[in-house]
């Protein structure tokens, strides 16, 4: 998704075909060395036998395994309904109502405007998702529901999901490329020149991007150490949501925000240590002077044909020993990740401009650009972000 809170999120991301550049030779990815078809392994052959399933259901130990797998399969099957239950809970503001007080069903129905019988079904579903709980005749907010309305940007993101779900309504046509994804034009509209026609929409999604960027910044700065940095430059940093968090942690650290001129014209100079550097990383060189450059939720917004030249420009801008920090949701590679390889991979595909990449793919691109000492700190929350550091040799 767009990485920050204003037009810089899209202005350097005009739609281009995904994968127009050469794909890294990572196993399982386009462009990888060919591999001959193999045999189905033993355990999978067992799982393909209906007769063995029936036998395992009767065995004291094996029935636990089959039951657990059955529950996992049904969780996948019912996933869309779960997401729609969550959207309904958000739209009826159930969690916010319960954050103020616990209510019996009749009074809760009055506050939501729903008929009691339908609200009862919704509340049971929300309780099954552990968002709410029922105690002593009252519906109450559960810890998970409290966390949901507390995490910045999460509720707004759920409200945004129908745009993505409309694109995925026919997944066969979507994957074959037979439809024009609505999401591909959504963010350029929200943060582009037409946004002046719907200022409320732009403001709402600007806040969403700023909120989500703060969460990414928090996780990123827990994984990297900037105490020895002389100047940090955030490339494609929008109006500065990431650097704002950096400034709070390192108030004396000089900062540079690099983005398009019209983006910087609405950015807030929140620190006396902050400099603006207008430019386009597509068309202009990256300014020199920073020994740490950050790319936060930038790479997955762009195809390889944009990312590879960008990494080369960053390498040229850094001094020897300078560091590049990349922070974004990354694919799992050899160990597929449920959040990134399902949600973010399909989200970026619907945007029609970028793709999620595994750490190994990014490492290969960095080495091709001339970087050395590529490392990946242990990820705190891969569904929020992962971090890769690299050094100019």
Swiss-Prot record:
S-adenosyl-L-methionine recorded as keyword: yes
Class of this enzyme: transferase
Top-rank taxon: Bacteria
Gene Ontology molecular function terms on file: hydroxyneurosporene-O-methyltransferase activity; O-methyltransferase activity; protein dimerization activity
Pathway: Carotenoid biosynthesis; spheroidene biosynthesis
Keyword match Transferase: yes
InterPro entries to which the protein is assigned, alphabetical: COMT-like, O_MeTrfase_dom, Plant_O-MeTrfase_dimerisation, SAM-dependent_MTases_sf, WH-like_DNA-bd_sf, WH_DNA-bd_sf
EC code: 2.1.1.210
Biased composition (Low complexity): 26-36
Region (Disordered): 1-36
UniProt record, GO biological process: carotenoid biosynthetic process; chlorophyll biosynthetic process; methylation; photosynthesis
Annotated S-adenosyl-L-methionine binding sites: 259, 297
Keywords linked to the UniProt accession: Carotenoid biosynthesis, Chlorophyll biosynthesis, Methyltransferase, Photosynthesis, S-adenosyl-L-methionine, Transferase
Pfam families listed in its UniProt record: Dimerisation, Methyltransf_2
Family: Belongs to the class I-like SAM-binding methyltransferase superfamily. Cation-independent O-methyltransferase family.
PANTHER family, per the entry: O-METHYLTRANSFERASE CICE, PUTATIVE (AFU_ORTHOLOGUE AFUA_4G14580)-RELATED
Entry function: Methyltransferase that mediates the O-methylation of 1-hydroxy carotenoids. Converts hydroxyneurosporene to methoxyneurosporene or demethylspheroidene to spheroidene. Also able to produce spirilloxanthin.
Record's protein name: Demethylspheroidene O-methyltransferase
């Amino acid at each position: 998704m767009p990485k920050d809170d204003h037009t810089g999120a899209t202005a350097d991301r005009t739609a281009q075909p995904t994968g127009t550049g050469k794909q890294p030779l990572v196993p399982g990815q386009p462009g990888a060395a060919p591999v001959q078809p193999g045999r189905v392994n033993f355990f999978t052959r067992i799982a393909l036998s209906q007769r063995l399933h029936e036998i395992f259901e009767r065995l004291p130990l094996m029935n636990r395994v089959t039951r657990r797998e059955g529950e996992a399969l049904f969780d996948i099957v019912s996933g869309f309904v779960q997401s729609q239950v969550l959207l309904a809970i958000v739209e009826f503001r159930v969690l916010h109502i319960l954050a103020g007080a616990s209510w019996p069903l009749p009074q809760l129905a009055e506050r939501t405007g729903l008929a009691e019988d339908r609200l009862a079904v919704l509340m049971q579903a929300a309780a099954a998702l552990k968002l709410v709980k029922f105690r002593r005749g009252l519906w109450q907010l559960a810890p998970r529901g409290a966390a949901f309305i507390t995490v910045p940007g999460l509720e707004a993101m759920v409200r945004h999901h129908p745009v993505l779900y409309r694109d995925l309504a026919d997944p066969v046509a979507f994957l074959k490329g037979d439809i024009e994804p609505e999401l591909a034009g959504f963010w350029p509209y929200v943060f582009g020149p037409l946004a002046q026609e719907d200022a409320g929409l732009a403001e709402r999604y600007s806040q969403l991007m700023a909120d989500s960027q703060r969460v990414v910044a928090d996780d990123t700065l827990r994984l990297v150490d900037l105490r020895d940095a002389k100047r940090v430059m955030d490339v494609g940093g929008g109006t500065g949501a990431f650097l704002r968090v950096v400034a709070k942690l390192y108030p004396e650290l000089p900062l540079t925000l690099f983005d398009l001129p019209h983006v910087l014209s609405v950015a807030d100079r929140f620190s006396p240590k902050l400099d603006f550097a207008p430019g386009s990383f597509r068309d202009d060189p990256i300014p020199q002077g920073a020994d740490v450059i950050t790319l936060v939720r930038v790479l997955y917004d762009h195809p390889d044909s944009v990312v590879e030249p960008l990494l080369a420009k960053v390498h040229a801008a850094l001094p020897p020993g300078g560091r590049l920090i990349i922070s974004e949701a990354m694919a799992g590679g050899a160990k597929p990740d449920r959040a990134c390889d399902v949600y973010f991979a399909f989200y970026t595909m619907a945007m029609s401009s970028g793709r999620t990449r595994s750490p190994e793919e990014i490492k290969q691109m960095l080495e091709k650009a001339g970087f050395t000492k590529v490392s990946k700190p242990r990820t705190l929350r891969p569904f929020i972000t992962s971090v890769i550091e690299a050094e100019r040799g």
